[in-house]
């Protein structure tokens, strides 16, 4: 539920390496 400061509209979350996932076009972590 914490925004990772990255969008995932056109590309996947690069922050997925630290546990972030794409939700509603924005990368979130928990």
Curated annotation (Swiss-Prot):
One GO BP annotation of this record: defense response
Transmembrane segments: none
Tissues with expression: Expressed in petals and roots but not in leaves, petioles and runners (at protein level).
Taxonomic superkingdom: Eukaryota
Stated family: Belongs to the cyclotide family. Bracelet subfamily.
Domain notes: The presence of a 'disulfide through disulfide knot' structurally defines this protein as a knottin.
Function field: Probably participates in a plant defense mechanism.
Protein name, UniProt field: Cycloviolacin-O10
Organism per entry: Viola odorata (Sweet violet)
UniProt lineage: Eukaryota, Viridiplantae, Streptophyta, Embryophyta, Tracheophyta
């Amino acid at each position: 539920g914490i925004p990772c400061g990255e969008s995932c509209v056109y590309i996947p979350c690069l922050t997925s390496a630290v546990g972030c996932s794409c939700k509603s076009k924005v990368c979130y972590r928990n």
